[in-house]
């Protein structure tokens, strides 16, 4: 069987060679939602003969923005973002459908379990009030990435040997998401961020940026860290840095 698992992500938010770690949630969950709003198309000159899904979509978007601020405990970490709005193809025609889509991220498993029902309630309620109907597709993608305290302490101890105590830093939760989280639901996990930022090398651009570049000089340290973690989990000593 597998006793524990370790992983790392290169991290442009930390200086090259630094290691970011924390116990508990370290990366958020990620779910995708898509709402199809059905109205009734018509001519823009005669809106009374149509049922406008575009206005309805705008109202749904505005209402969704109050979910985090009005329904969530302020101490919870939740992000609800709208990433797509589609409606119509002509400037003088009221379309019959509109589509609103986005994503939800949180570090709470309980909050995550509630979000589909909340979004459905908002979409159905707004659409009913504005004579439209809503069809929600909600797709869970990645769970919360949670670091086991014991495994994380082993990883930190290995990092002290490989990178030095001065290069270990505590990091806040990142609201990005990671499929490594699935492993953490099965066995104790330790996931860390390996800094790559070096302005002179051009490796300080944000992730998913066209100018993002990996600092290759740091990668061997990451490999050494994972090897040291595995050795410590097996009760073996690892070479000093």
Regions found by a protein language model. Name each.
Residues 1-95, 177-178:
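Histidine/acidic-residue-rich, glycine-tolerant segments that coordinate divalent metal ions
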Residues 54-241:
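Metal-dependent amide/peptide-bond hydrolase catalytic core
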């Amino acid at each position: 069987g597998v006793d524990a698992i370790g992983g790392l992500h290169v991290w442009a938010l930390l200086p090259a060679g630094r290691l970011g770690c924390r116990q508990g949630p370290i990366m958020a969950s990620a779910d995708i939602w898509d709402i199809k709003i059905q109205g009734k198309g018509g001519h823009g000159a005669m809106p009374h003969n149509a049922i406008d899904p575009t206005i309805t979509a705008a109202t749904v978007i505005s209402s969704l923005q109050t979910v985090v601020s009005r329904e969530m405990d302020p101490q919870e970490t939740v992000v609800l973002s709208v990433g797509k709005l589609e409606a119509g193809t002509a400037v003088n025609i009221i379309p019959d459908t509109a589509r609103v889509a986005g994503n939800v991220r949180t570090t709470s498993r309980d909050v995550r379990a509630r979000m589909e029902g909340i979004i459905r309630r908002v979409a159905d309620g707004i659409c009913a009030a504005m004579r439209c109907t809503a069809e929600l597709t909600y797709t869970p993608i990645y769970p919360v990435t949670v670091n086991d305290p014991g495994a994380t302490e082993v990883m930190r101890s290995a990092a002290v040997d490989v990178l030095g105590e001065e290069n270990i830093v505590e990091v806040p939760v990142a609201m990005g998401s990671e499929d490594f989280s699935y492993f953490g639901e099965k066995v104790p996990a330790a996931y860390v961020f390996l800094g790559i930022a070096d302005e002179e090398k051009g490796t300080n651009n944000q992730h998913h940026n066209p100018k993002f570049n990996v600092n290759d000089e740091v990668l061997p340290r990451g490999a050494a860290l994972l090897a040291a973690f595995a050795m410590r989990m097996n009760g073996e000593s690892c070479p000093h840095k």
